[in-house]
């Protein structure tokens, strides 16, 4: 179970970093599409 929790945490971190990297340079419309 610990490994699954670790995987979920890593995925969440990757997703949040990816969303930030994608939505930062885009205009509000683009970030609204992503989020």
From Swiss-Prot:
Its EC number(s): 2.-.-.-
GO BP field: cell wall organization; peptidoglycan biosynthetic process; regulation of cell shape
UniProtKB keywords: Cell shape, Cell wall biogenesis/degradation, Glycosyltransferase, Hydrolase, Peptidoglycan synthesis, Periplasm, Signal, Transferase
Subcellular location(s) of the protein: Periplasm
Gene Ontology MF terms in the entry: glycosyltransferase activity; hydrolase activity
Pathway per the UniProt entry: Cell wall biogenesis; peptidoglycan biosynthesis
UniProt entry tagged with the keyword Metal-binding: no
Ranges in coiled-coil conformation: none
Name the record gives this protein: Probable L,D-transpeptidase ErfK/SrfK
Native species: Klebsiella aerogenes
